[in-house]
């Protein structure tokens, strides 16, 4: 009975994607206009992140966000059964050579960072098909057991191993002799007991957890950033960018700052594609951080 959600997802996954997109239109309308799912949070996040925009821009971006959020939801479910050739066609890649080893050569390890932008579920699958080394996806278990089981099966479909946030250090030490790719979305709000780095992100003093930098120090792996762009409905492109080839040459704070800069640059390219329902700024910075925070960056203009 606890896994009812799992079988509901299985049934939806069996639908053709064209039918699922029709359901997505209904889902977008329900979440934005009927149930108003976190509409206040979305509005606040957009206004605080882009304070110089017009009312028309806020309304248009919010509406586009809910449409794409619904699309990504049904796409993630469809990904459970999507064949590899279709995945590689729907999410093309460039610049991933640092994680791809020619035949006969040792796999190349790395730490792969990204954000909740565009279709991050397909990105996990695509990364596991692209990288030569085994991919370990770091994740937080979902509260619903059925949804969690479905997500684990989907994300691990092409060989990825799913590791919880709490168990990642133990997993890294256990497999330290095997080159691996550690993949994680590092833009979530950290817990109060985690090591935190405060910085400016989207015009706000924001907390980032230091986990990626700690992993880089422990493993000595190069660190990369995966930037996805939405080309059209169900079509994406993932570009691999280098954050640090040798972690020893960069401080942990510098590494996080470079990640944050790439994250913000990516969001500004397609702001409607970020996960604005997330209560990203729920942690308040200490007063000392507020007093020493740099001035707000100049607003980068983007088309509404």
Predicted features and spans:
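Non-catalytic C-terminal accessory region of glycerolipid acyltransferases
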Residues: 52, 63, 104-105, 129-130, ...
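Catalytic core of membrane glycerolipid acyltransferases/transacylases, capturing the structured
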Residues: 107-166, 178, 191-200
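Membrane-anchoring hydrophobic helices of lipid-metabolizing enzymes
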Residues: 1-114, 119, 148-153, 159, ...
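Residue-level detector of family-conserved "landmark" positions at structurally sensitive sites
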Residues: 22, 56-57, 138, 165, ...
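Short, composition-biased local secondary-structure segments
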Residues: 12-15, 118-124, 174-187
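Short acidic/polar alpha-helix capping motifs at helix-coil junctions
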Residues: 6-11, 88, 115-117, 134-137, ...
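Short Gly/charged-rich anion-binding patches and loops
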Residues: 7, 41, 122, 150, ...
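A conditional alpha-helix N-cap/helix-loop micro-motif detector
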Residues: 89-93, 117, 144, 162-165, ...
């Amino acid at each position: 009975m606890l896994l009812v959600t799992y079988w509901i997802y299985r049934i939806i996954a069996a639908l053709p994607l064209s039918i699922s997109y029709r359901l997505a239109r209904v889902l977008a309308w329900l979440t934005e206009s009927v149930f108003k799912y976190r509409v206040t949070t979305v509005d606040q996040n957009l206004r605080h992140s882009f304070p110089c925009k017009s009312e028309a821009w806020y309304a248009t971006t919010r509406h586009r966000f809910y449409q794409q959020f619904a699309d990504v939801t049904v796409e993630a479910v469809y990904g459970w059964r999507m064949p590899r050739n279709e995945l590689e066609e729907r999410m093309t890649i460039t610049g991933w050579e640092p994680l791809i080893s020619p035949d006969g050569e040792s796999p190349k390890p790395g730490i792969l960072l990204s954000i909740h932008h565009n279709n991050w579920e397909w990105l996990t699958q695509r990364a596991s098909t692209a990288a030569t080394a085994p991919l370990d996806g770091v994740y937080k278990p979902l509260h619903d057991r059925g949804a969690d089981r479905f997500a684990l099966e989907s994300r691990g479909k092409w060989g990825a191993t799913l590791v919880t946030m709490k168990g990642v250090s133990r997993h890294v030490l256990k497999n330290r002799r095997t080159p691996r790719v550690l993949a994680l979305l590092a833009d979530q709000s950290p817990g109060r007991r985690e090591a935190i780095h405060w910085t400016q992100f989207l015009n706000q003093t924001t907390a980032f957890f230091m986990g990626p930098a700690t992993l880089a120090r422990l493993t000595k792996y190069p660190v990369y950033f995966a930037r996805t762009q939405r080309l059209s409905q169900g079509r994406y492109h993932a570009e691999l960018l280098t954050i640090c080839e040798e972690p020893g040459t960069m401080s942990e704070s510098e590494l996080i700052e470079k990640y944050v800069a790439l994250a913000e640059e990516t969001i500004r390219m397609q702001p409607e594609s970020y996960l604005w329902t997330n209560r990203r700024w729920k942690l308040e910075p200490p007063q000392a951080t507020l007093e020493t925070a740099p001035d707000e960056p100049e607003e980068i203009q983007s088309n509404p």
